[in-house]
Every structure is written in structure tokens, then in C-alpha cells.
From Swiss-Prot:
It is found in: Virion. Induction: Expressed in the late phase of the viral replicative cycle. One of the minor capsid proteins that constitute a network internal to the major capsid proteins and outside the lipid membrane. The minor capsid protein P12 does not serve a cross-linking function between neighboring capsomers, it may play a role in the viral capsid assembly. It comes from the Viruses. Keywords: Capsid protein, Disulfide bond, Late protein, Virion. Signal peptide: none annotated. The hydrophobic regions might anchor the protein in the underlying inner membrane. Residues 23-43, 46-66 are annotated as: Hydrophobic. GO terms for cellular component: viral capsid. Interacts with the major capsid protein. This is Minor capsid protein P12. Transmembrane segments: none annotated.
Amino acid sequence: MGNGPPMERAVSSDDILTYYNTFIFFIYFNFTNENIYIIYTIYMKVQNTIVYIVLLLIVVVIIWNFTRKEGWSDYNAPNDFMKIYYSNIVEDKKLAEKYPFFGTGPFTGLRCRKPNNVGCNTTWVSGQLVELTPKLKEQIECKFGIQYVKT
């Protein structure tokens, strides 16, 4: 043990515990007199553990940024569709001026600007937004044989 050349020796459990951290996850379930023990042991190097935590944080930040940007919506940009629709495509310009678009999300443009469509007389007929006149209401009731109740 003096000043001689270093001697090779076998790896002991002390060496393993020096270079590795031991994480033991112990999960206990009790289902009506039935005990299930799940012991899961993971051996990782300390350096690798830090790297894995940093990588996990990077992935979490990327996912958070993506979901914040997307907003979990079908259309991830500002909803300008109805502005374009009413300015360029709508069939009746006077109707568009009388009942401007209202709402957000899937209800944009399907109602007039008054909340819950109260006081607005518009409806969709054959894919066109039209004013609901007494004559049109009568025609709808006659065609379908039921009283027209606007929702």
C-alpha cells in the first residue's frame, strides 16, 4: 500500500453507490383486502439526472409555448373570416350594414351584434344570411308544416 503502482481491484457496492444515485419509487395500492406492491428502482448517474431534468424542462417550455400560441383552437390566427365575409362576399350589402357580425369562436357572424340575437331578425336560408320577414317566416312554416321558432 505504499508508493507502489496502483493496483486493480474489484468493483464494490461502495463504488456503485459513489457513482450512482438510487431512486426507489414505492407505490402502495390497497384494493379490498388485496395489497399490490410495485417497487420500481432506477439507477442513474447524477450527471445524467441533471441533463434529463434540463431536457424535460426544455420540452415542457416548448409544449407550453406551442399550446399558448395555438390556444387549442381550430384556427390559430385572429378570426378575420367574418370581416372578410361581410366586406367582400356577403350577397346583400345593406343587410351586412344593418346586421354587422357579432360573436367569437364558432358563433362569429351567425348572430347579429346584439347579445343572444335579441331584436335581430336574421336567419340562414340555403347558405345565405337573410332578413327574417313575416313573409319568409310564413313560407318556412308552410314548407315544413311547423311553427317557426327562431333560436
